[in-house]
Amino acid sequence: MTIHIKNNVNWVGQRDWEVSDFHGTEFKMTKGTSYNSYLIQEEKTVLIDTVDHRFSHQFIQNLEMEIDLASIDYIVINHAEEDHSGALAALMEKIPGTPIYCTENAIDSIVGHHHHPEWNFNPIKTGDALDIGNGKQLIFVEAPMLHWPDSMMTYLTGDAILFSNDAFGQHYCDERLFNDEVDQTELMDQCLRYYANILTPFSALVTAKIKEVLSFNLPVDMIATSHGCVWRDNPTQIIHQYLEWADNYQEDRITIFYDSMSNNTRMMADAIAQGIHDVDPAVAVKVFNVSRQDKNDILTSVFRSKGILVGSSTMNNVMMPKIAGMLEEIAGLRFRAKKAGAFGSYGWNGGAVDRIHSRLTDAGFETAVGLKAKWRPDGQAMKLCREHGQFIAKQWALAPLTTTFNTINVDKKIQTIEEPVVLVEPSAELEKPATEVTSSKDAKQCMLCSVCNWVYDPEIGEPNQGVEPNTPWSSVPNDFLCPECHLGKDVFVEIK
């Protein structure tokens, strides 16, 4: 099956309605995808990209219905990933020796995937041109790390079509190919989802590459992507949208996501969200349970947000595994100009909140005061959680707020906290921690682990964790773990 694009250019790709996972399980496809391949028939015949390897036979069979494969003069591979070059090996069995134009990095990747170093590779550089007859040329533009080192774009003069590779694309499958034919809300949602989950780490490169392409002053009548719709109606709209997304994008939105063992952290999330709306009814607050909702939806919401709040119960003195995985994804996506805070419930020890706070700080977020609640939050603790949400709303507001609320109650409680994490005990007000002074008694005070009865002796210390002899308990690091049961400092009590 072919779809006419413009003049002597046709789409010869493959739709995939059933695919649900991309990059392993990194990206969940909710609308399928398409593998877009294009056939240009001027004096020279050019094939731009192939399809995923699972459709190799069908792709070649369809192509043979349109042309004699031997008439293909050149193959252009904009990207070596298997969903672009997957059918290349099967095609080259039919037409060995056909010149392949791609970047130097693509040669390395294609050979690594297909193991055919003897293929007729022709490496290109930005600005190189290939004459295809009838007064038309293909002009190549390298686009490294958008989103692989081998990536490039190809521009067809005369028809003013930019074959943009993954840029400006979407994992979106529809019987209709052009952007003006499909549901606009679905289309832009999928564009945003694609950018947020795949291209966000390369935003600075996106801006630089778009400006470079625009500096060539070439007309762009169509943008033919590698996945999803071809942009023929106002094609530069997606270029301008990319420039906006790449520029530290944020909306007036706060994303809260959490995982909870016994529903306690979920209760905190609900109360915090209510507190935010008490103060700033205009802000969009989105709440997600990472165990039940799609992670790519969550990451897309994070991309759109001015700030995020991450909650977890404490398990084995660390955060819940799915929260740890989400924070690893967030660190890799390298979000910029966003605020963050941690919260969570615990029983013996509240190590999860401390770790989340640290991970968010390391990931480049401007971190706010965190919040811990011991056991199941009661009415007073829920009130404090709600006030914490009010404080967050005030601190993160993008414009002056007109809503009145208990300013003294919120500000005083948060400002009195010197540590990065606030401890909320049921039926207890927040109080400023007492200043720790090392006394002679403290220097000799042994501490008992209330769980396993291991004893910390200051005279001995704990060399395996870098705690030197003669270190008083007050100077032992907060991330110290009992060597026997691996719980934190919170479970230790003084030996009377």
From Swiss-Prot:
Q: Does the keyword Hydrolase apply?
A: no
Chain residues that bind Fe cation 2? D83, D166, H227
**Which UniProt keywords are given for this protein, alphabetically ordered?**
Cytoplasm, Electron transport, Flavoprotein, FMN, Iron, Metal-binding, Oxidoreductase, Transport
Protein residues bound to Fe cation 1: H79, E81, H147, D166
Molecular-function annotations in GO: electron transfer activity; FMN binding; iron ion binding; nitric oxide reductase activity
The free-text cofactor remark is: Binds 3 Fe cations per monomer. Binds 1 FMN per monomer.
PROSITE patterns to which the protein is assigned, alphabetical:
FLAVODOXIN_LIKE (PS50902), RUBREDOXIN_LIKE (PS50903)
Annotated residues for binding of FMN: 260-264, 342-369
Region ranges (Zinc metallo-hydrolase): 30-210
Q: Where does this polypeptide localize?
A: Cytoplasm
Rubredoxin-like domain sequence ranges: 444-495
Per its UniProt record, the required cofactor names are: Fe cation; FMN
Q: What CDD domains would the database entry show?
A: flavodiiron_proteins_MBL-fold (cd07709), rubredoxin (cd00730)
By its UniProt entry, which Gene3D superfamilies does this protein fall under?
Answer: 2.20.28.10, 3.40.50.360, Ribonuclease Z/Hydroxyacylglutathione hydrolase-like
Residue intervals of the Flavodoxin-like domain: 254-393
Metabolic or biological pathway, per its Swiss-Prot or TrEMBL entry: Nitrogen metabolism; nitric oxide reduction
Q: Where does Fe cation 3 bind?
A: C449, C452, C482, C485
Q: Record's GO cellular component, any one?
A: cytoplasm
What biological function has been recorded for the protein in this entry? Anaerobic nitric oxide reductase; uses NADH to detoxify nitric oxide (NO), protecting several 4Fe-4S NO-sensitive enzymes. Has at least 2 reductase partners, only one of which (NorW, flavorubredoxin reductase) has been identified. NO probably binds to the di-iron center; electrons enter from the NorW at rubredoxin and are transferred sequentially to the FMN center and the di-iron center. Also able to function as an aerobic oxygen reductase.
Assembly notes: Homotetramer.
**Of which family is this protein a member?**
In the N-terminal section; belongs to the zinc metallo-hydrolase group 3 family.
Database matches in PANTHER family: ANAEROBIC NITRIC OXIDE REDUCTASE FLAVORUBREDOXIN (PTHR43717:SF1)
What is this protein's record name?
A: Anaerobic nitric oxide reductase flavorubredoxin
Organism, per UniProt? Aliivibrio fischeri (strain ATCC 700601 / ES114) (Vibrio fischeri)
**What's the gene?**
norV
